[in-house]
């Protein structure tokens, strides 16, 4: 494995662990030239998951988009980034375990919202405000009322 810092091809593995619930192997490596450490992941090369957007366009699934959306929703909230990565990986795993190769962005958004609702109500409302694209304050207040009343349709 080539060192990302100095380009040297001589690196050694100093730690190996299962990652992503056993679907990947995480390796810590150290460059024998510059002594810097870096992490690599080994994963199965599986069929791609396609996301069908609201406008009908399609793109490859990207777990990182879920993670960055979670980060934005949870900004300045007492939630560990590792928990957000865990949620993104859980959603990815759930989607890949389905037999369908395509998933709608709507389904992904609902999966994120259901997990955020359990994790942190403020983060849930933040995410919902962007995801549901509230047209005005009243529609936003309706979502808050559902949350406060324990409504199932939120």
Curated annotation (Swiss-Prot):
GO molecular function per UniProt: ATP binding; DNA binding; zinc ion binding
One Pfam family in the UniProt entry: ATP-cone
GO terms (BP aspect): negative regulation of DNA-templated transcription
Disulfide links within the chain: none
Cofactor: Zn(2+)
ZnF start-end (unnamed): 3-34
Cofactor note: Binds 1 zinc ion.
UniProt KW keywords: ATP-binding, DNA-binding, Metal-binding, Nucleotide-binding, Repressor, Transcription, Transcription regulation, Zinc, Zinc-finger
Domain annotation ATP-cone: ranges: 49-139
Function text: Negatively regulates transcription of bacterial ribonucleotide reductase nrd genes and operons by binding to NrdR-boxes.
Family: Belongs to the NrdR family.
NCBIfam families: transcriptional regulator NrdR (TIGR00244)
Protein name per Swiss-Prot or TrEMBL: Transcriptional repressor NrdR
UniProt organism field: Carboxydothermus hydrogenoformans (strain ATCC BAA-161 / DSM 6008 / Z-2901)
